[in-house]
Amino acid sequence: SSQAQVFADVSPFVQSCVDGYKVCIFAYGQTGSGKTFTMEGLRGDYDKRGVVPRAAEQMFTTAAELKLIGWTYEFSASFLEIYNDELRDLLPAGAEAKGKASVPAKLDIKHAGGEVHVPNLRSVPVTDAEQLSRLMDAATRVRATSATKMNEHSSRSHYIFRMRLVGKNSK
């Protein structure tokens, strides 16, 4: 399937997110099967953009359209890595500019009020798809990678990207 075909299948879920529903898009498969490519795509090749860049574009475009009828949205993003049973914030302070990881506060998964959250995980306000792309690049640069027998560029970790939308209608 092409990246466009894959996104066509998940696009209704992205719209549901803008409509106020919680949505999870999950890529699962064997090492080397294309999970990272499906989600991130190939930077610089418009036709090979992945689910995340296409979803961001759809969300920001829809938010701009809905502004005409009184809706405003605030977006924020976080990037969490799970590697060797440890949680790591892929966007420590200044990561966008420096491209370096620092030793963050201890991260742990918590459950409260029907929500799953990670205290101390940095959440960055995002205003457009290009800014999100830069943040994703910064997160990718500090992600754990190592060759395996199946894939010489394996990420060797699980990567959770979270986009939070808060929508309000003034009418």
State the predicted function of each range.
Residues 35:
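Conserved lysine of the Walker
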Residues 1-30, 40-171:
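P-loop NTPase "switch/coupling" elements that transmit nucleotide state to mechanical/effector output
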